């Protein structure tokens, strides 16, 4: 899980989710997991 100020989709399988005001990226490639913080 990368924690970044700016989260962007890395590949076309990445999906942007917003849970409780936290922006997350989930992807089938585990290296692409990110959250904003």
Curated annotation (Swiss-Prot):
Q: Extract the GO molecular function terms from the UniProt entry.
A: structural constituent of ribosome
Q: Which GO terms describe its cellular component?
A: cytoplasm; ribonucleoprotein complex; ribosome
Q: Which SUPFAM superfamilies match?
A: Ribosomal protein L36
The signal peptide, as residue positions, is none
Domain of life according to the entry: Bacteria
Any GO BP annotation? translation
Alphabetically sorted, this entry's keywords are: Ribonucleoprotein, Ribosomal protein
Instruction: Identify the NCBIfam families for this entry.
Output: rpmJ_bact (TIGR01022)
What family is it from?
A: Belongs to the bacterial ribosomal protein bL36 family.
Name of the featured protein: Large ribosomal subunit protein bL36
Q: Identify the coding gene.
A: rpmJ
């Amino acid at each position: 899980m990368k924690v970044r100020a700016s989260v962007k989709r890395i590949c076309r399988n990445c999906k942007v989710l917003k849970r409780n005001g936290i922006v997350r990226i989930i992807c089938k490639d585990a290296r692409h997991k990110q959250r904003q913080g």
